[in-house]
Amino acid sequence: MGFKEGDAKKGANLFKTRCAQCHTLGEGEGNKIGPNLHGLFGRHTGSVEGFSYTDANKAKGIEWNKDTLFEYLENPKKYIPGTKMAFGGLKKDKDRNDLITFLQDSTK
C-alpha cells in the first residue's frame, strides 16, 4: 500500500502534537532540533542549508515526495539507518496519509 489523500485537518493536529517540537514549516523560519520543512516536496535528503545532517541522511539520495514520505514516516530509523531523527514513526497508514496531506500545502 502507498500514499492516499488524507484529512489535512487531522494531519495538522498530528503535526502539532508529534512534529512541531522539532520542525518548523514556514519559509525563513529557522531549523530547530530537526530541519525546517518549507519546500519539502521535491527536495533531496540531507539538503536543508544550515542543518547538521548525519552522513546517512546525506547519502540516502532520495527525493521527498508523497510515497517516500509515506514509507519514511512509518519508521525513520529503518528507512534511513543512521538518521538522528528520534521520532519512532507513525504506524497507521491513515495517520501518515493525514500528515502528508497536511504537509503538501503547509510546506509550499
UniProtKB/Swiss-Prot annotation:
Belongs to the cytochrome c family. Pfam families: Cytochrom_C. InterPro entries: Cyt_c-like_dom, Cyt_c-like_dom_sf, Cyt_c_1A/1B. Transmembrane segments: none annotated. It comes from Stellaria longipes. This is Cytochrome c. Keywords: Electron transport, Heme, Iron, Metal-binding, Mitochondrion, Respiratory chain, Transport. Binds 1 heme c group covalently per subunit. The keyword Electron transport applies. The lineage of its organism: Eukaryota, Viridiplantae, Streptophyta, Embryophyta, Tracheophyta. It is found in: Mitochondrion intermembrane space. GO terms for cellular component: mitochondrial intermembrane space. Electron carrier protein. The oxidized form of the cytochrome c heme group can accept an electron from the heme group of the cytochrome c1 subunit of cytochrome reductase. Cytochrome c then transfers this electron to the cytochrome oxidase complex, the final protein carrier in the mitochondrial electron-transport chain. GO terms for molecular function: electron transfer activity; heme binding; metal ion binding.
